[in-house]
């Protein structure tokens, strides 16, 4: 498929056009027509109904939903993607509410600042969806994409979306979407590209605190940061003057290894080794909330259950439905840039960290090996990291 850049899509939306937005191939892997409510024209919903034929929905911000008392359609949402459908609506000035004209009227009234909850009949023929406050950075769905795109065009935070179906009633994917794009001369973007666009456009971290932190390995400066869009908390330990070509360790949080000294992994040993090195030579440790290579603590324990049944650390992740490594290093790169660091010496045995930082503009001048002893309990784990994940150990 041939995708367009985000800026060209924003211009098209602001001109009242409809675009195609494609989500992740591991999610729905489908394309929706998306329009911005404030800019869309009288033919937009008719085009969606005639050409796309999916369910026409109206993503809105939480503020709009709360102001108009758009309550959730069900109390117990069991949708696998957590789509926040509200009760369906028609504006009171409509008749049946189903015509393209009347659904357009209802959508436009959603963003009218003079509209009140009493101005909408329930149920109706337009289906509002409530977007997460932090948009695609919190949830990579079409709902959030539509509201984010509206905001990026300077419009009120609301859109209209419709899934694209083939003539035979199946969902359009891949080359079907490409043909639809070419037939109707539409811009087509991915939610992944929208996520990256927002990451580059907006700061993702906030500095919160700095303290002296005495430890068993020396006294460090500890900085506290908050991830703007996920509310995750990140701490950074530094020793000595901060400079270019800083010695840097990116350490993914490991409760079992770092705190309980588990011998299933080498995480705790690597952290202690890095703290000793940084205390002696100066540098920085960025402690990232990426438990279990990004799958979280409880899923890591589930992976351990599978390992006890004969899986390894990679096949266990895959069996649980995850990639072998979900970590992203954009936050780490943002923290380095906060300290005006673009060139580092990286304490790591993991090549993916090198590539992960390079894609966000961080130059790795030198790799510093982190040497820790194996134990009888983590031998197979270490071998898997070396053979299947390419770790330099």
Swiss-Prot record:
Mg(2+) 2 binds at residues 28, 142. Zn(2+) binds at residues 254, 265, 267. Keywords: GTP-binding, Hydrolase, Lyase, Magnesium, Manganese, Metal-binding, Multifunctional enzyme, Nucleotide-binding, Riboflavin biosynthesis, Zinc. GTP binds at residues 249-253, 270, 291-293, 313, 348, 353. D-ribulose 5-phosphate binds at residues 27-28, 32, 139-143, 163. GO terms for biological process: riboflavin biosynthetic process. One of its GO terms (cellular component) is cytosol. The keyword GTP-binding applies. In the N-terminal section; belongs to the DHBP synthase family. In the C-terminal section; belongs to the GTP cyclohydrolase II family. This is Riboflavin biosynthesis protein RibBA. It comes from Staphylococcus aureus (strain MSSA476). The gene is ribBA.
